[in-house]
From Swiss-Prot:
<comment type="subunit">
    <text>Component of the chloroplastic Clp protease core complex.</text>
</comment>
<dbReference type="GO" id="GO:0004252">
    <property type="term" value="F:serine-type endopeptidase activity"/>
</dbReference>
<dbReference type="InterPro" id="IPR029045">
    <property type="entry name" value="ClpP/crotonase-like_dom_sf"/>
</dbReference>
<dbReference type="Pfam" id="PF00574">
    <property type="entry name" value="CLP_protease"/>
</dbReference>
<dbReference type="InterPro" id="IPR023562">
    <property type="entry name" value="ClpP/TepA"/>
</dbReference>
<dbReference type="InterPro" id="IPR033135">
    <property type="entry name" value="ClpP_His_AS"/>
</dbReference>
<comment type="similarity">
    <text>Belongs to the peptidase S14 family.</text>
</comment>
<keyword id="KW-0934">Plastid</keyword>
<dbReference type="GO" id="GO:0004176">
    <property type="term" value="F:ATP-dependent peptidase activity"/>
</dbReference>
<keyword id="KW-0645">Protease</keyword>
<feature type="active site" description="Nucleophile">
    <location>
        <position position="101"/>
    </location>
</feature>
<keyword id="KW-0378">Hydrolase</keyword>
<dbReference type="GO" id="GO:0009570">
    <property type="term" value="C:chloroplast stroma"/>
</dbReference>
<keyword id="KW-0720">Serine protease</keyword>
<dbReference type="GO" id="GO:0006508">
    <property type="term" value="P:proteolysis"/>
</dbReference>
<feature type="active site">
    <location>
        <position position="126"/>
    </location>
</feature>
<protein>
    <recommendedName>
        <fullName>ATP-dependent Clp protease proteolytic subunit</fullName>
        <ecNumber>3.4.21.92</ecNumber>
    </recommendedName>
</protein>
């Protein structure tokens, strides 16, 4: 029997009676957001919408994005990263479990000094990948050009946000690089390891 999303009581300010809302909606009201799956258009759009809404509602209260993601699509992930930079509140990023591939890119996008990993979390970085189409040669060339542009963008972001030199990041992105939370801190991807 599936459990589903639990319901919790929530009372709006000024109301006497609490209503029952699902757990995630209750946490959203506290500005606690979750990325707990592959990065795709649907989840990215949902989180971006929440970030913008919460920013409009109160641009002074920080937002907290908890990440446990194996990665996913590059374009939706870059869109989420850009939204984090755009909204006026600081966005804290917290790695719980795994932040791999696009998950680590979103993790590094948190407000500098406000990026955290739990002690047993794992972080993995690598270059963007593509399943090259079996189409015509011209399509292959266009796709590979776009992939190189994306790699350059991702590399620049890691360089800027980690403080590591370009050659270190470029070398790291050549393969899958797994890190413990302290290693991710030493690498500049997170600022703190929770205790």
């Amino acid at each position: 029997m599936p459990v589903g999303v639990p319901k919790v009581p929530f009372r709006l300010p000024g109301e006497e009676d609490a209503s029952w809302v699902d757990l995630y909606n209750r946490l959203y009201r506290q500005r606690l957001l979750f990325l707990g799956q592959d990065v795709n258009n649907e989840i990215s759009n949902q989180i971006m919408g929440l970030m913008v809404y919460l920013s409009i509602e109160d641009g002074t209260k920080d937002q907290y994005l908890f990440i446990n993601s194996p990665g996913g699509s590059v374009i939706p992930g870059v869109g989420l990263f850009d939204t984090m930079q755009f909204v006026s509140p600081d966005v804290h990023t917290i790695c719980i479990g795994l932040a791999a591939s696009m998950g680590s890119f979103i993790l590094v996008g948190g407000e500098i000094t406000k990026r955290l990993a739990f002690p047993h979390a794992r972080v993995m970085i690598h270059q963007p990948a593509s399943s090259f189409s079996k189409g015509k040669t011209g399509e292959f060339v266009l796709e590979s050009t776009e992939l190189l542009n994306l790699r350059e963008t991702i590399t620049k972001v890691y360089v800027q946000r980690t403080g590591k030199p370009l050659w270190v990041i470029s070398e790291d992105l050549e393969r899958d690089v797994f890190m413990s939370a302290p290693e991710a801190q030493a690498h500049g991807i997170v600022d703190l390891v929770a205790v």
